[in-house]
């Protein structure tokens, strides 16, 4: 259904507002159903994973109560600990300062966040496939038409290995901005501290690395 909406958006740009309203309503309904299923099956591995997936849409007090009601082994599982980390962490939002975290490039070289000092940053969480050709071309053009002294684009990819990160970089050939990952998947700071779930999630900062825009999807 979402693909049909995106197709409509391309073919009927004059209906953009109405199509976006429909899309938002679909997302809201999907989230409502996912949360209900997460609560119902929270004591199972798949339900706990769904609970983590919907964490950003659940009040933390409620989420804490649900987690506390689960068997100890579920609470101490990887996903249970990820949910606890989410609960114990204040997520970044507009007005927050970007928080560097250890990660590497596709060449397995530690990414140096210090090189970004004094520059605006556009940090993206995944999403190159989701954004389509138009979105990828926009990023390429933005990178080429801006000065690296003013703006850096950093793409975090949720890879499980350096080989996976390399293959992603090779697949999206021609994208010269930085590709990075820490291979921690759901336990990564990009998921816990930054609160990323939907792809792409984008953070635009000012030159002091204060987040001025955050967008999802």
List where the protein language model places each region.
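A non-transmembrane, solvent-exposed segment enriched in polar/low-complexity residues
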Residues: 1-32, 36
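Thiol/disulfide oxidoreductase modules built on the thioredoxin-like
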Residues: 174, 184-217
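N-terminal "domain-start" segment that seeds a small globular fold
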Residues: 81-113
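Short active-site neighborhood of thiol/selenol oxidoreductases, capturing the structured segment around
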Residues: 111-139, 152
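Structural microenvironment flanking redox-active thiols in thiol-disulfide oxidoreductases
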Residues: 134-173, 185-191
